[in-house]
Amino acid sequence: MGRFIFVSFGLLVVFLSLSGTGADQDCLPDWSSHERHCYKVINEYKTWEEAEQYCTEEANGGHLVSFHNRQEVAFVVKLGYTILKADVVWIGLRDFWRECQWEWSNGAKLNYKGWSDEPNCFIAYTVGNRWVRRKCSSTHPFVCKSPA
């Protein structure tokens, strides 16, 4: 009886210590959870296309990161700067048909904006929350996002 109580108490402690850490978000190892999504900062320099392909192969439903509110931007910017110490990362925003019809690589609507005018793919500064268009053939680190 004493062992049963000890084991039960131990399991309760483990459960309580994991709750609220994102462990229950079903993110892959080395991914961080935020608002029912998983994020991974990749410290490899790739073109936009290569980065998007990496993200889609890395996780089920994965794409370059898309932003839908300021809190998500703040989370990713902090995560990116902490890991990379770099000032820019690819994000999933692109003018796919070169007609100024901006889309996220995961097909989501563009409902949050923050950029200046330039080419057809976007980077985000990890300091200052600014988006800038860059040539899709340039290389940068990037952030992947997938559903939890």
UniProtKB/Swiss-Prot annotation:
SMART domains in the cross-refs: CLECT (SM00034)
Keywords (A to Z) from UniProt: Disulfide bond, Hemostasis impairing toxin, Secreted, Signal, Toxin
Gene Ontology CC entries for this record: extracellular region
Secretion signal, residue range per the UniProt entry: 1-23
Tissues with expression: Expressed by the venom gland.
Compartments in which it is found: Secreted
Keyword check for Secreted: yes
UniProt-recorded Gene Ontology molecular function terms: toxin activity
Disulfides per UniProt: 27-38, 55-144, 121-136
Pfam families the UniProt entry points to: Lectin_C
Principal location class: secreted
Domain named C-type lectin: residues: 34-145
Domain of life: Eukaryota
Subunit comment: Heterodimer; disulfide-linked.
Family (UniProt): Belongs to the snaclec family.
Function summary: Interferes with one step of hemostasis (modulation of platelet aggregation, or coagulation cascade, for example).
Something else known: Shows greater sequence similarity to the beta than alpha subunits compared to other heterodimer snaclecs.
Name this polypeptide is given: Snaclec 7
Organism for this UniProt entry: Echis pyramidum leakeyi
